[in-house]
């Protein structure tokens, strides 16, 4: 394993509160402190602080983010800071995912259906490959990192080392490649496949798509190894020796597969006896038919669809024992940084229960063996046993993180840019819509943007319609919009294609929009989750990247949460102003590229690796969509996708499954066009 040092590339030096925060965190890590909090306001450079800590400690790091959008943003930032090191991205590789489920009330079985993004799958393989081959690794991940992944022991054991001069026949190498789930394809050469031309074998590893390996044979000996461009065949360089890693994380050697299949048959027999003794013959027949079909496929091909449901047997785990996951690929001394910890920590704790509820129904009614329950995310307690030293990063850390860290907090209030927290003003609710309309028009005249947050979906819809009728360009961000469409709407706001964005609970963490100079919160005095102190502070922060930032709270009373949020914001504002005066700094609005966080990640998708379907999705040919009919801008396409999704759900509700499937395929095609746009 390569032991390369982290090299931080930046023209900036830590400033403001950053040097003290970096020094404090590094010292605590050196003294063995397991849990600590980095309390940093929006725009204070928390990512830069974390990067400096990683470079100073020189240990592998996992950055855990609450969603794909933030993970993509962090991935791009860390790649820029550590260009010479391995910065990888690990999130769910599904563009579309319908989990397997059964609804007893209507006797409806829903088959698993999904579309896998090939580029993200490549990035996941690159992440595990990096962890097994070097130590200078930063992995940016979502909660996908706690879901079951193949055993790192089997994954590492089944690598294929090749070396010039090695006695290794082509037939033997092809056999080994097939065993680790590479496919021979002499015509469509892509990631995870190999081809043969005379005495030359070429393979594209699972963790690459821009480079292939060319292995030349002389008889039964390897004569030469080189890296080539898979498209042009141009030789990029010679290689003395290399290692080919498996094409799937769920790989197993033949002996282990035979043992696992025997265990599956034993479990099947035991389960069938239970059903028969309870006179549940339908469930018994269903389970036997489905399991025997899977076993037959495993016998012939070495894998089956949904093989992850048998992962307990493949790994040799006992019933109830947690699965291997990305955390098991890290060395024991890795560092964990939990970004937006007040959201991410509860999210980690919630994953297990939701997964368990769905799978229990499948097991009870004979669609899966009980061992399928052990293909699951980690329970929260299991997650805690797998992590080492942790830094919880948030502007508003939750009670759990504060208790866990026992008061070990590094505070980062000063923004190096000099930007101060926005001025917060409370206005009465009487005439609030007309007052807000005037404020929005004033911002639009100055080419600035406005975020408005409401408490209910109905209010958001009505307000959006009213502002639109009054001549403003306004968009509504709601929970039915997926990640890519959401980013398209946000980019439209940043480009000035709309002036106002209205939402409910979607305008808090991670929305980095420097063009926003006004955040307006309606019904601010309605106490609750969306108007708690932490939620209000996070929402205020959306206006903290603009020098003219201001927050207007429409309320008839000042609640305890409002008062606490305003007092904390005022404290931070005063501290920043004092620092600015002492250092002669004039606050200036942040200038940020209009590229989305996903541009780098999805770039390969628009070059041909669009994503591969699984389940029924693979067979259905997408209908040709006349995109021009709906406009070619990302916003028009996003709106049409929303319309098609509503039609798809309605069709499924009316049991018009063929129409629903056609609509689904049109949605997939439009999403691919949206990525390209």
From Swiss-Prot:
SUPFAM superfamilies this protein is in?
C-terminal UvrC-binding domain of UvrB, P-loop containing nucleoside triphosphate hydrolases
Chief site of localization: cytoplasm
GO terms (BP aspect):
nucleotide-excision repair; SOS response
- Domain UVR: where? 638-673
- Ranges for domain Helicase C-terminal: 432-594
* Gene Ontology CC terms: cytoplasm; excinuclease repair complex
Which controlled-vocabulary keywords does the entry list?
Answer: ATP-binding, Cytoplasm, DNA damage, DNA excision, DNA repair, Excision nuclease, Nucleotide-binding, SOS response
Q: Tell me where it resides.
A: Cytoplasm
CDD domains associated with the record:
DEXHc_UvrB, SF2_C_UvrB
Has UniProt tagged this entry with the keyword Metal-binding? no
Q: What residues bind ATP, as annotated?
A: 40-47
Query: Which ranges belong to the motif Beta-hairpin?
Result: 93-116
- Write out the GO MF terms: ATP binding; ATP hydrolysis activity; DNA binding; excinuclease ABC activity
Q: Which PANTHER family match?
A: UVRABC SYSTEM PROTEIN B
Q: What is known of its domains?
A: The beta-hairpin motif is involved in DNA binding.
**Function, please?**
The UvrABC repair system catalyzes the recognition and processing of DNA lesions. A damage recognition complex composed of 2 UvrA and 2 UvrB subunits scans DNA for abnormalities. Upon binding of the UvrA(2)B(2) complex to a putative damaged site, the DNA wraps around one UvrB monomer. DNA wrap is dependent on ATP binding by UvrB and probably causes local melting of the DNA helix, facilitating insertion of UvrB beta-hairpin between the DNA strands. Then UvrB probes one DNA strand for the presence of a lesion.
Please give the family membership noted in the entry. Answer: Belongs to the UvrB family.
**Identification of the protein by name:** UvrABC system protein B
């Amino acid at each position: 394993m390569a032991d390369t040092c982290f090299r931080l590339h930046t023209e900036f030096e830590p400033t403001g509160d950053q040097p003290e925060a970096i020094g404090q965190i590094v010292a605590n890590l050196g003294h063995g402190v397991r849990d600590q909090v980095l309390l940093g306001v929006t725009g204070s450079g928390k990512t830069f602080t974390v990067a400096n800590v990683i470079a100073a400690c020189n240990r592998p790091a996992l950055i855990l983010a609450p969603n794909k959008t933030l993970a993509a943003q962090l991935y791009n930032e860390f790649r820029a800071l550590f260009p010479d090191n391995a910065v990888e991205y690990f999130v769910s590789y599904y563009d579309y995912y319908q989990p397997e489920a059964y609804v007893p009330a209507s006797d409806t079985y829903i088959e698993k259906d999904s579309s896998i993004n090939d580029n993200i799958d490549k990035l996941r393989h690159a992440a595990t490959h990096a962890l097994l081959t070097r130590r200078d690794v930063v992995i940016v991940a979502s909660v996908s990192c706690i879901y079951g992944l193949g055993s790192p022991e089997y994954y590492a054991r089944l690598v294929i080392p090749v070396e010039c001069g090695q006695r290794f026949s082509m037939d033997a190498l092809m056999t080994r490649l097939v065993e680790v789930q590479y496919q021979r394809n002499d015509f469509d050469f892509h990631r995870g496949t190999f081809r043969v031309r005379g005495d030359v074998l070429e393979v594209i590893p699972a963790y690459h798509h821009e480079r292939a390996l060319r292995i030349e044979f002389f008889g039964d000996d390897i004569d030469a190894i080189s890296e080539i461009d898979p498209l042009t065949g141009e030789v990029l360089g010679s290689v003395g020796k290399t290692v080919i890693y498996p094409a799937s994380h769920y790989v197993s050697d033949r002996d282990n597969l035979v043992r696992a299949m025997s265990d599956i048959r034993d479990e099947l027999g035991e389960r069938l006896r239970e059903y028969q003794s309870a006179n549940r013959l339908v469930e018994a027949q269903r389970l036997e038919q489905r399991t025997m079909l899977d076993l037959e496929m495993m016998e012939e091909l070495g894998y089956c669809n949904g093989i992850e449901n048998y992962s307990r047997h493949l790994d040799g785990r006992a019933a109830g024992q947690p699965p291997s996951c990305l955390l098991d690929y890290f060395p024991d001394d890795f560092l964990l940084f939990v970004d937006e910890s007040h959201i991410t920590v509860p999210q980690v704790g919630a994953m297990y229960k939701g997964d368990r509820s769905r799978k229990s129904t499948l097991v009870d009614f004979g669609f899966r063996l009980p061992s399928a329950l052990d293909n699951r995310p980690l329970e929260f307690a299991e997650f805690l046993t797998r992590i080492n030293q942790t830094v919880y990063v948030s502007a508003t850390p939750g009670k759990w993180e504060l208790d866990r860290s026992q008061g070990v907090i590094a505070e980062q209030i000063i923004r190096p840019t000099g930007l101060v927290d926005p001025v917060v003003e409370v206005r009465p609710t009487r005439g609030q819509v007309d007052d807000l309309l005037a404020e929005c028009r004033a911002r639009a005249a100055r080419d600035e943007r406005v975020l408005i947050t409401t408490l209910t979906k109905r209010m958001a819809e009505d307000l959006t319609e009213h502002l639109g009728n009054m001549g403003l360009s306004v968009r509504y961000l709601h929970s039915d919009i997926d990640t890519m469409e959401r980013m398209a709407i946000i980019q439209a706001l940043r480009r000035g294609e709309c002036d106002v964005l209205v939402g409910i609970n979607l305008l808090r963490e991670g929305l980095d929009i420097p063009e926003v100079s006004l955040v307006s919160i309606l019904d601010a005095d309605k106490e609750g989750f969306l108007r708690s102190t932490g939620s209000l502070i996070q929402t205020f922060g959306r206006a903290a990247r603009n020098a003219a930032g201001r927050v207007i709270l429409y309320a008839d009373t000042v609640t305890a949460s409002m008062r606490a949020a305003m007092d904390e914001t005022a404290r931070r504002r005063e501290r920043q102003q004092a620092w600015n005066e002492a250092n002669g700094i004039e606050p200036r609005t942040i200038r940020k590229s209009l590229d989305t966080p996903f541009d780098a990640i999805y770039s390969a998708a628009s070059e041909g690796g669009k994503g591969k379907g699984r389940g029924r999705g693979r067979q259905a040919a997408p209908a040709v969509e006349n995109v021009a009919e709906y406009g070619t801008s990302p916003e028009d396409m996003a709106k049409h996708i929303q319309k098609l999704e509503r039609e798809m759900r309605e069709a499924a509700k009316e049991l018009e499954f063929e129409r629903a499937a056609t609509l689904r395929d049109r949605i997939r095609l439009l999403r691919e066009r949206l990525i390209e746009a």
